[in-house]
């Protein structure tokens, strides 16, 4: 959860397609954006959604206004990240305090029916460094220009 003022602008974290934009139970007004490689971001308790299902959005584009709809007692954004439906901590890729992107790529492995997200990628084939980076991202500001985040899905033999 990210504390906000009433009706602050929520922006898309990456390029993608809006999969859901509607009132949804305890989440209140919700926007779910599907990005490349199975990544989804979710933004809920919105006062007003500015996009609808099927809309194509760019990184940094306004998608909603913050609120406290659903099961919420104060204005905030409930922000989730998912890979193929599995939740993972957004702090693995975002530094919300500094407004930067922590990683340029992440590694996902399947453990039975669960997807495990890691940030250390020992594979020599990956040109991008998995070390922490300080790239601004558009959740708060439209300065992150890449618009997408590489996600490496490895099977058990490649671990």
PLM-predicted stretches and their roles:
Residues 43, 47-62, 159:
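C-terminal soluble interaction/assembly domains
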Residues 7-9, 22-24, 68-71, 82:
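Short polar/acidic secondary-structure junctions
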Residues 10, 16-18, 54-66:
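A structural signal for short beta-strand/turn segments enriched in small hydrophobics and glycine
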Residues 41-47, 68, 72-75:
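Peptidoglycan cell-wall recognition and remodeling modules
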Residues 52, 80-159:
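Acidic, glycine-rich catalytic/binding loops that coordinate metals and/or anionic ligands
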Residues 12-50, 80:
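Zn2+-dependent peptidoglycan hydrolase active-site motif and core
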Residues 1-12:
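Short glycine/threonine/proline-enriched tight-turn/helix- or strand-capping micro-motif at secondary-structure
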Residues 2, 30-31, 57-72:
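Short hydrophobic beta/alpha edge segments that flank linear recognition/processing sites
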């Amino acid at each position: 959860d990210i504390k906000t003022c009433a009706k602050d602008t929520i922006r898309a974290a990456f390029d993608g397609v809006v999969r859901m934009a509607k009132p949804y139970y305890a989440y209140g007004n919700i926007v779910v954006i599907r990005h490349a490689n199975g990544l989804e971001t979710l933004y809920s308790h919105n006062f007003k959604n500015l996009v609808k299902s099927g809309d194509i959005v760019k990184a940094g584009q306004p998608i909603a206004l913050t609120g406290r709809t659903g099961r919420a007692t104060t204005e905030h954004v409930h922000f989730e990240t998912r890979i193929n439906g599995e939740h993972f901590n957004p702090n693995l890729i975002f530094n919300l305090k500094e407004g930067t992107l922590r990683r340029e790529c992440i590694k996902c492995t399947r453990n039975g029916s669960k997807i495990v997200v890691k940030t250390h990628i020992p594979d020599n084939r990956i040109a991008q460094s998995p070390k922490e980076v300080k790239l601004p991202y558009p959740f708060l500001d439209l300065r992150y220009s890449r618009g997408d985040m590489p996600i490496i899905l490895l099977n058990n033999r490649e671990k």
